[in-house]
Design a protein with these regions (language model features):
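Cytosolic Rossmann-like ligand/nucleotide-binding regulatory domains
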Residues: 459-511, 515
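Residues in well-ordered beta-strands of folded domains
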Residues: 100, 454, 476-479
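Alpha-helical transmembrane segments and immediately membrane-proximal extracytoplasmic
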Residues: 1-441, 447, 482-483, 496, ...
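Short amphipathic
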Residues: 449-456
């Protein structure tokens, strides 16, 4: 019976590998519609809830009453978080490392449990005023939705991974109104290559989810910047070089902090004898003073980014905002509540860019009208360095601000920041988070699957028998000049060809590292 099941699964995988573009687009549309509704409503409820909480803090006339309401809300969220995270630990944090782990065959999420628990607790946690982003949870919710559709369709493992990737990209697209960035994020951060197995359905899902989001929120870009920002002359481009170096170093410091904040929480928890499930209470207690005195900088950070181009801030105020948001972003994320670092990183990057911009304006190097470009460049460079996904950073910021004229400066700053981060031996932040959680989540159930990867320059020109593949990995077919042929030990690999491998799910990441 088990052998028949494996044969049926293998037939499904090879059928999916040869499926038409139209069928893959159809699956992508299904995922996009579902994820667009899930993430669109998730985003809508977070925005409404956050405005209510922020309003309580801003209503200074009834502050005592409002603080009592806020305290009761925070207590409820803390108790609910303890209950839900004990029953489903994979809803903690942003969720992006968990999605990466699933796509690499290192774990298998209970899609329904993750979906409804992350949805409810994510809305409450992110709307509470903590400096958490909605984008990481949106990606995990999208991935869970994609897996749900795969289960409903009784898909093969390879098709299931394709739909999970499509859902993840659709989640980012709906959260940021950035469909192309959604596709690129999955390519750069998860797959590290283009594969027909997933990119067609992923793009379709991203576009459809974005369309649903636009129906809910309108056509205005998420971070709508002033029109007609004067471009800087070529003689001023040295500023971009220095800015990229600055953002690269700053990104490295951020990564070190965010990867170690959990240790601080564990140390404090042991000192005061509070169970890990109740660590969010520290974040809630510490966010209250910020809410009382600076309610305008609460939340994920999109309000902060927009305010930088609408008001004139001094260097001292910008530096104060950055320090507070940096520290409280760590406090918020380290609590383990559902919520991401995506938008908080962009907000911190915009503040760093604004700091550079203020210095340049005060020194007479640029005009005040050119100041907004520094806010935009700060977001792209800072996120590109921390994530080590420069293409995603550039396109994401471009889609969010709705202006493509800044691609050259964006590319320069982001590339320099990325290079500095690499020279400092900084790892992609989500991969580093995945490494930290692997001992808890890694699984090896021996289940095999089919994957498709391109022939890289690492293996181009070699014959199959020269690749030294693990004994449980088999290359089955090669697609050369659009024609599919069966592979044997003497088959030569040509750069740009696609090869199909039958492989244990738990070995996906290892084999990709070996061949790509």
């Amino acid at each position: 019976m088990e052998e028949q099941s494996e044969i049926l699964s293998s037939k499904k995988e090879f059928a999916f590998a040869t499926s038409t573009i139209l069928s893959q687009v159809g699956r992508g549309i299904m995922v996009g519609l579902l994820v667009g509704l899930i993430v669109g409503s998730f985003r809508f409820l977070i925005e409404k809830g956050f405005h209510i909480v922020q309003g309580f803090y801003q209503d200074q006339g009834n502050l005592i009453r409002n603080l009592l309401i806020i305290f009761l809300l925070y207590l409820f969220i803390c108790l609910l978080s303890a209950k839900l995270t004990r029953s489903e630990k994979d809803i903690k944090g942003s969720g992006i490392p968990q999605v990466e782990a699933e796509l690499k065959g290192l774990m298998s999420l209970n899609w329904w449990s993750v979906l409804w628990k992350k949805y409810i607790l994510g809305i409450l946690a992110i709307a509470s005023g903590l400096m958490l982003g909605r984008e990481g949870p949106s990606i995990q919710l999208g991935a869970a939705g994609g897996k749900g559709i795969a289960k409903w369709l009784k898909s093969s493992p390879v098709e299931e991974r394709s739909l999970i990737a499509s859902g993840a990209a659709a989640g980012l697209a709906a959260a940021f109104n950035a469909p192309i960035a959604g596709l690129l994020f999955v390519v750069e951060e998860v797959y590290h290559h283009f594969s027909r197995f997933f990119w067609v359905s992923t793009l379709a899902a991203s576009l459809v989810a974005n369309f649903v989001s636009l129906l809910i929120f309108g056509l205005t870009p998420v971070l709508d910047m002033p029109d007609n920002i004067p471009l800087m002359s070529l003689s001023q481009y040295w500023i971009y070089l220095l800015m990229g170096i600055f953002l690269g170093f700053s990104g490295f410091l951020y990564e070190k902090a965010v990867l170690n904040v959990g240790k601080v929480y564990d140390w404090i928890g042991k000192k005061v004898h509070i169970d890990k499930a109740y660590h969010p209470i520290f974040a809630f207690i510490l966010i209250i003073p910020v809410g009382i005195f600076l309610p305008q900088i609460l939340g994920g950070g999109n309000q902060v980014v927009l305010s930088l181009t609408e008001q004139d801030f001094s260097f001292q105020i910008l530096l104060t905002y950055f320090i507070i948001r940096f520290i409280w972003s760590m406090i918020s994320y380290g609590s383990g509540l559902p919520g991401g670092i995506f938008l908080p990183i962009l907000a911190l990057g915009s503040l760093l860019g604004a700091l550079v911009g203020v210095i340049c304006v005060n020194l007479g190097l640029v005009t005040q009208q050119q100041f907004p470009i520094f806010v935009i460049l700060g977001m792209s460079g800072y996120f590109g360095a921390i994530s080590k996904a420069p293409l995603t950073a550039m396109i994401l910021v471009t889609e969010m601000v709705g202006d493509i004229r800044n691609l050259m400066p964006l590319g320069m700053v982001t590339l320099v920041a990325y290079i500095v981060m690499d020279l400092l031996k900084g790892a992609p932040v989500y991969e580093a988070m995945l490494e930290k959680m692997l001992p808890e989540t890694a699984s090896d159930d021996g289940e095999v699957t089919l994957i498709e990867i391109p022939v890289s320059d690492k293996i181009a020109g070699k014959q199959v028998h020269e690749l030294n593949l693990p004994h449980n990995v088999l290359i089955t077919t090669q697609v050369h000049n659009g024609k599919r042929k069966t592979v044997n030990g003497s088959t030569r690999m040509y750069l740009g060809d696609m090869i199909h491998l039958v492989i244990p799910k738990s070995e996906i990441g290892k084999v990709k590292d070996l061949l790509l």
